Amino acid sequence: MEKFVRHDGLVAPLDRANVDTDQIIPKQFLKSIKRTGFGPNLFDEWRYLDEGFPGQDNAARLVNNDFVLNQPDYQGASILLTRRNFGCGSSREHAPWALMDFGFKAIIAPSFADIFYNNCFKNGLLPIVLSEDNVEALFQVVSSKGGYRITIDLEGQQVIPESGEPLPFEIDEFRKHCLLNGLDEIGLTLNEADAIRAYERSRIEREPWVFADH
């Protein structure tokens, strides 16, 4: 998993509350269990005016020019600003996969659905909770000024706007450690490889009958 220490990125404002995982990545695109390849169909039903299906050439589809991610000011955005209860609905892990494959590194919202919030950390996507007032203030400036950028300092736990005071955010220390060091569940396990091998050797010595050939 890629380390997340500090990130400066363009902000895209998705001014919708209660965005569910089926809106993030529709169900017809969930046939793959790879973590990549979902970005082209992120928010598919909002980005396009026609119905999408797996394997389709998106270049030939009808684009919804009114949707924020299709607008020139937000091309290349890596920080998503949105409203409360983002990621509600089913527990599909494909939702953070799609957001990351599209290029997002962090999401800022007043609240997240619990399962989606946990899945983000497991995959290296940083979900940041700010107050309703701070999120509203960011919406005002981001929506009025194209190309607005924000710096996220994970170590200092701050969202740093182009103008104004830094906004502190809370994060669990263990999750922060994992993101700073690029550790997912597999990486955490591999960090303990020597201890695991030592334990297995001690088990063979203590309980040889368990490992005897039958």
Swiss-Prot record:
Gene3D superfamilies tied to this protein: Aconitase, domain 4 (3.20.19.10)
Keywords: Amino-acid biosynthesis, Branched-chain amino acid biosynthesis, Leucine biosynthesis, Lyase
Residues passing through the membrane, by range: none
Cellular component terms per the entry's GO annotation: 3-isopropylmalate dehydratase complex
GO terms, molecular function: 3-isopropylmalate dehydratase activity
Protein's UniProt keywords contain Nucleus: no
Pfam families registered for this protein in UniProt: Aconitase_C
Catalyses which reaction(s): (2R,3S)-3-isopropylmalate = (2S)-2-isopropylmalate
Highest taxon, organism lineage: Bacteria
Pathway(s) it belongs to: Amino-acid biosynthesis; L-leucine biosynthesis; L-leucine from 3-methyl-2-oxobutanoate: step 2/4
Signal peptide: none
EC nos: 4.2.1.33
GO biological processes: L-leucine biosynthetic process
Family: Belongs to the LeuD family. LeuD type 1 subfamily.
Classification via HAMAP family: LeuD_type1
General function of this protein: Catalyzes the isomerization between 2-isopropylmalate and 3-isopropylmalate, via the formation of 2-isopropylmaleate.
NCBIfam families: leuD, PRK01641.1
Oligomeric and partner information: Heterodimer of LeuC and LeuD.
Name of the protein in question: 3-isopropylmalate dehydratase small subunit
